[in-house]
From Swiss-Prot:
InterPro entries: aa-tRNA-synth_II/BPL/LPL (IPR045864), Ala-tRNA-lgiase_IIc (IPR002318), Ala-tRNA-ligase_IIc_anticod-bd (IPR018162), Ala-tRNA-synth_IIc_core (IPR018165), Ala-tRNA-synth_IIc_N (IPR018164), Ala-tRNA_ligase (IPR050058), Ala_tRNA_ligase_euk/bac (IPR023033), DHHA1_dom (IPR003156)
Binding site for Zn(2+): 564, 568, 665, 669
The protein, known as: Alanine--tRNA ligase
Gene Ontology BP term (one): negative regulation of DNA-templated transcription
Protein family membership: Belongs to the class-II aminoacyl-tRNA synthetase family.
Domains as described in the record: Consists of three domains; the N-terminal catalytic domain, the editing domain and the C-terminal C-Ala domain. The editing domain removes incorrectly charged amino acids, while the C-Ala domain, along with tRNA(Ala), serves as a bridge to cooperatively bring together the editing and aminoacylation centers thus stimulating deacylation of misacylated tRNAs.
A Pfam family of this chain: tRNA_SAD
Entry's EC annotation: 6.1.1.7
SUPFAM superfamilies given in the database record: Class II aaRS and biotin synthetases, Putative anticodon-binding domain of alanyl-tRNA synthetase (AlaRS), ThrRS/AlaRS common domain, Translation proteins
Source species, domain of life: Bacteria
Species name: Burkholderia orbicola (strain MC0-3)
Keyword list, A-Z: Aminoacyl-tRNA synthetase, ATP-binding, Cytoplasm, Ligase, Metal-binding, Nucleotide-binding, Protein biosynthesis, RNA-binding, tRNA-binding, Zinc
Any one GO MF annotation of this record: tRNA binding
GO cellular component: cytosol
Length: 874
């Protein structure tokens, strides 16, 4: 039975038992910031179990894509070396939310395994929690499992309820016993049943875990029964497939065998048992699905984990002899295996391929040099009888050549060595400290404040008349008074000033009364609800308790608002034009422009840029109102509001409807889209692999930009004696004229070189049957020098030639050697002999090489030495 059929039978079985088939959630958890990746089937149902996310069903079943390669759950280092470790796996599960409990859960599992999958009953063993008599009796008395194959497992992890058969969500909260089902591979495989000293062997393999959420544990450790008891089960598809396909390693199942064969094809390896092929086959699954879910290779967080996995796969390909990009070629094979079950993979095939190819090409630029350094260091350690690689060197490989620590550790392990990880960590810490010392940080963090929060009025007002000073800070310390000329941070009880957040810069403006004037240069958060006004006291003395008029720079705010609102419209337009994979990765909105970074793996075409501009300007012309609502986060997301990747949101969120855009946003915005005026993209480029950046301007800035562009067009048209409407045609005519003249000039240069070549041939000196010539060719470019050398070689038959030209204070050199002489006189060595004397270097083939230099004054002497240099080698 193939893996695809196993998956389908599982889902269909539970659907027949009244379960709703729920599609796999993203590998990036949307409801649990503590998790790096979705690592089990229950993650998407966590809030359902907690009662905060009501669903229209009480029974569910899933095939959940899962990754264990970061944070607490990290299987990366074992992948490829064991039979059952993977970075990516599929977790089959069925769930009951206050519906059925132990009886049905156990009976469903037994029926599926023994009737649908037809596993022999005498091959199945089960474990239960020591005190779970109910589960024990169901297995023994109702299902009929012999008691010798039912094993009670107690608190075997050193604490009360710390057991392989007791599940907890955390230190407090829902928890309960679990029962696990094991498959016995038979006496030919070493190992003992669970709970025995030999349980780590491969004979008895856990295939299904049924968790019974029965209790709630409080902070004192007290257990109370949950009013609604639930079930969470998980069974690894790959493990089950190995059992049903009668193999002992997950890598022997059909799905993996097809990927391993594909990996062998692209790496040109015939030995299908090579562990590196297993690594590559595993990693293409994790990498592809992470990219499908919006993760891009990067230097931190999820992006760095993805980069580590990609580079580990590349390193194993390199180990097999691949010196160029190969990994991305496996995406099509993965789509063939899993694209039907997961159509999102098929839809994103080209994007996944492009992202992986770019990451490969980037790493292949450094891997060879890095590997040579690592291999030399390991050889040195071995020669000295050591077993530990210096952590400082491992850090250099990480910092300079992009080698993740686990990649270096992987190579070391293959040689029976380890890495000095504490030394690596020390080096990393030093670098971070240096970076902190070198950077300039705004003085908002670390200010000690324990007063009331600031009330923000900036959504409605640009000024507030009776703002009271509640705290003052100078150089990071709280003070009671600030004097004229001092820089300070002012905290008010009420303010219209927006504090930098969500990509929007903080407001500027003035705090003043009859005797005092404080110029606000920036506004930043001291705490989540406390706003700090950063600036300089220009007049008077400012004390805690003073009352001021707080007024923002209204013109600057208006420009910033236009840019911020345009960013929302642009984000939506980018998704319409480029695809739903577009995700915001960063932004900066100020009075001058909006800068927007987003996930996309190719430069935008001119047509795509024009389409985005058109869509945004159409929304501006529609003059739609901006509608703001405050609502619970879950309600907002269900209503279609876009939650931005990496942003933190509270229980209550601010939702902005602006034209066709709906986003969660706490920033300030225009009242109607027409207030934006005009939208123009001025910059599009790449900032990292898979990340593009767009800069755009609005309003009067956009009008001014278009006017300046129009003026330049008119100037160019006048210079070419054409009307602006004819400019493109006139430029094409001029380009044709230039091309024709360049061709004519090239012909004249060749003709001149030919005539000079005849003269130069007469200057050649014969040494040992080889004609040697070193001369300057006035007015020649590199192409002319090469052509002249070729003609001289043909004319002289046996020769070693160096020709030079000087232009703009720079020397161009070409050396040519005929085949009969190139065994003793190499053109690359000859040209370098001259180049080093004129402040340069070069290289090339034994018969033709070129170089440059910056010291033309030394050229005559350098050319004069050629005859002697050649004579020594003949």
């Amino acid at each position: 039975m193939k893996a695809a059929e196993i998956r389908e039978k599982f889902l269909k079985f539970f659907e027949s038992k009244g379960h709703t088939i729920v599609r796999s959630s993203s590998l990036v958890p949307g409801n649990d910031p503590t998790l790096m990746f979705t690592n089990s089937g229950m993650v998407q149902f966590k809030d359902v179990f907690l009662g905060t996310d009501p669903r229209p069903y009480s029974r569910a079943t899933t095939a959940q894509r899962s990754v264990r390669a970061g944070g607490k759950h990290n299987d990366l280092e074992n992948v490829g070396y064991t039979a059952r470790h993977h970075t990516f796996f599929e977790m089959l599960g069925n769930f009951s939310f206050g519906d059925y409990f132990k009886h049905d859960a156990i009976k469903f599992a037994w029926e599926l395994l023994t009737t649908v999958y037809q596993l022999p009953k005498d091959k199945l063993w089960v474990t239960v929690y020591q005190e779970d008599d109910e589960a024990y009796d169901i297995w023994a008395k109702e299902v009929g499992v012999p008691t010798e194959r039912i094993i009670r497992i107690g608190d075997n992890k050193g604490a009360r309820y710390a057991s392989d058969n007791f599940w907890t969500m955390g230190d407090t909260g829902p928890c309960g016993p679990c029962t696990e089902i094991f498959y016995d591979h038979g006496p030919d495989v070493w190992g003992g049943p669970p709970g025995s000293p030999e349980e780590d062997g491969d004979r008895y393999i856990e295939i299904w875990n049924l968790v019974f959420m029965q209790f709630n544990r409080d902070a004192q450790g007290n257990m109370t029964r949950l009013p609604k008891q639930s079930v969470d089960t998980g069974m690894g598809l790959e493990r089950l497939a190995a059992v049903l396909q009668h193999v002992h390693s997950n890598y022997e199942i059909d799905l993996f065998q097809n990927l391993i064969k594909a990996a062998a094809r692209v790496t040109e390896i015939s030995d299908l048992t090579n562990n590196s092929l297993k690594v590559i086959a595993d990693h293409i699954r994790a990498c592809s699905f992470l990219i499908v879910d919006g993760v891009i290779p990067g230097n931190e967080g999820r992006g760095y984990v993805l980069r580590r996995i990609v580079r580990r796969a590349i390193r194993h390909g390199y180990k097999l002899g691949r010196k160029g990009a190969f990994f991305h070629k496996l995406v099509a094979d993965l789509v063939a295996e899993m694209g039907t079950a997961y159509p999102e993979l098929k839809e994103a095939e080209q994007r996944v391929t492009d992202v992986l190819r770019q990451e490969e090409e980037r790493f292949f630029e450094t891997i060879e040099h890095g590997m040579s350094i690592l291999e030399a260091a390991l050889a040195d350690v071995e020669a000295k009888g050591g077993k530990v690689l210096d952590g400082e060197l491992a850090f250099k490989l990480h910092d300079t050549y992009g080698f993740p620590l686990d990649l270096t550790a992987d190579v070391c392990r293959e040689r029976g060595m380890t890495v000095d990880e504490p030394a690596f960590d020390d080096a990393m810490a030093r670098q971070r400290e240096q970076a902190r010392a070198a950077g300039k940080f705004k003085a908002t963090q670390g200010l000690e404040y324990s007063g009331a929060k600031t009330t923000f009025h900036g959504y409605e007002e640009i000024a507030f008349d009776d703002a009271k000073v509640v705290a003052l800070y100078v150089d990071g310390s709280a003070v009671n008074e600030v004097k004229a000329g001092q820089d300070a941070v002012v905290v008010l009880d009420h303010t219209p000033f927006y504090a930098e957040s969500g990509g929007q810069v903080g407001d500027q403006g003035v705090l003043a009364n009859a005797a005092t004037r404080f110029a606000v240069a920036d506004t930043l958060k001291v705490q989540a609800d406390v706003i700090g006004h950063h600036g300089t006291l220009e007049q008077g003395t400012l004390k805690v308790g003073d009352v001021l008029r707080a007024e923002i720079d209204a013109q600057r705010r208006a420009r910033t608002q236009r840019n911020h609102s345009a960013t929302h419209l642009m984000h939506k337009a980018l998704r319409e034009v480029l695809g739903a994979h577009v995700q915001q990765k960063g932004s900066l909105v100020d009075a001058d422009k909006t800068r927007f970074d987003f996930a996309h793996n190719a430069p935008m075409t001119d047509d795509e840029i024009r389409r985005v501009e058109q869509i945004v300007n159409d929304e501006i012309l529609a003059n739609a109102p901006g509608i703001v609502r405050v609502m619970p986060y879950d309600e907002a997301v269900k209503g279609g509001a876009m939650a931005l990747f990496g942003e933190k949101y509270g229980d209550e969120v601010r939702v902005l409807d602006l034209g066709f855009s709906r986003e969660l946003c706490g920033g300030t915005h225009v009242h109607r889209t027409g207030d934006i005026g005009l939208f123009k993209i001025v910059v599009e480029g790449g900032v990292a692999a898979g990340i593009r950046r767009v800069e755009a301007i609005t309003g009067d800035n956009a009008v001014r930009y278009v006017q300046e562009l129009d003026a330049r067009v008119n100037e160019a048209a006048a210079a070419l004696k054409a009307q602006p409407s004819e400019l493109t045609q006139r430029i094409a005519q001029v380009q044709e004229q230039v091309k024709s003249l360049e061709k004519e000039l090239g012909a004249l240069k060749s003709k001149l070189a030919s005539s000079q070549g005849d003269e130069l041939a007469q200057q050649a000196v014969e040494i040992g049957g080889v004609y040697v010539l070193a001369a300057t060719l006035d007015g020649a470019d590199a192409k002319t020098l090469r052509e002249t050398v070729d003609k001289l070689k043909d004319k002289l038959k046996s020769a070693a030639i160096v020709l030079a030209a000087v232009e703009g204070g720079k020397v161009s050199l070409i050396a040519g050697v005929t085949p009969d002489a190139s065994k003793k006189v190499k053109a690359g060595e000859l040209v370098n002999f001259v180049a080093q004397q004129v402040g340069g270097k070069g290289g090339g083939r034994p018969d033709m090489a070129q170089a440059g230099g910056t010291e033309p004054a030394n050229l005559p002497g350098a050319l004069a030495g050629v005859k002697g240099w050649v004579e020594e080698r003949l």
